[in-house]
């Protein structure tokens, strides 16, 4: 129904962003909202997919068409909901997920929150041969530039983002200690570092 939303990015939250267009603010769930940090208070285009449930209508947004297509493929798999699909795409590019599927790399897929061995196997069974690996993923429309900000804030916001993706506080306790030992130029960088730690 909504192929994309183009407008001013007004807010960033751990699980979603808000884009204002024609006087309406659209709440859009994203894999990693801090990818959009550079564009806060500026115009942005986000590829979207509307999912209607009995209790809600949720808009999901992505920085590229490849990412959106991968999300739509994942949620067709039995046992994979939008939240799990977002968690996978928060840490991996579409091509990385496709390679794991084509190579039947269940171990790679089970690193994500909510994805056990049975679900990983189902992803492979349902999607192998149906997802095309491109030569290179389309450049993200949203590249985050390094900015100088308070390190503690970066880490705190990164931890909120990781918790929103479904990782437990126990899993994140060690991650937070490691993140606090390093310096980051953006929340997105801290989130990416945290994701690498939690899935390693």
UniProtKB/Swiss-Prot annotation:
Residue ranges of the region described as Domain III: 150-200
Compartment(s) where it occurs, according to its Swiss-Prot or TrEMBL record: Cytoplasm
Region (Domain II): 64-142
Principal localisation: cytoplasm
GO CC annotations, alphabetized: cytoplasm; Holliday junction helicase complex; Holliday junction resolvase complex
Keyword DNA-binding set for record: yes
One GO biological process term: DNA recombination
Subunit record text: Homotetramer. Forms an RuvA(8)-RuvB(12)-Holliday junction (HJ) complex. HJ DNA is sandwiched between 2 RuvA tetramers; dsDNA enters through RuvA and exits via RuvB. An RuvB hexamer assembles on each DNA strand where it exits the tetramer. Each RuvB hexamer is contacted by two RuvA subunits (via domain III) on 2 adjacent RuvB subunits; this complex drives branch migration. In the full resolvosome a probable DNA-RuvA(4)-RuvB(12)-RuvC(2) complex forms which resolves the HJ.
Function: The RuvA-RuvB-RuvC complex processes Holliday junction (HJ) DNA during genetic recombination and DNA repair, while the RuvA-RuvB complex plays an important role in the rescue of blocked DNA replication forks via replication fork reversal (RFR). RuvA specifically binds to HJ cruciform DNA, conferring on it an open structure. The RuvB hexamer acts as an ATP-dependent pump, pulling dsDNA into and through the RuvAB complex. HJ branch migration allows RuvC to scan DNA until it finds its consensus sequence, where it cleaves and resolves the cruciform DNA.
UniProt similarity note: Belongs to the RuvA family.
Protein name per Swiss-Prot or TrEMBL: Holliday junction branch migration complex subunit RuvA
Natural source organism: Staphylococcus aureus (strain NCTC 8325 / PS 47)
Organismal lineage: Bacteria, Bacillati, Bacillota, Bacilli, Bacillales
Gene label: ruvA
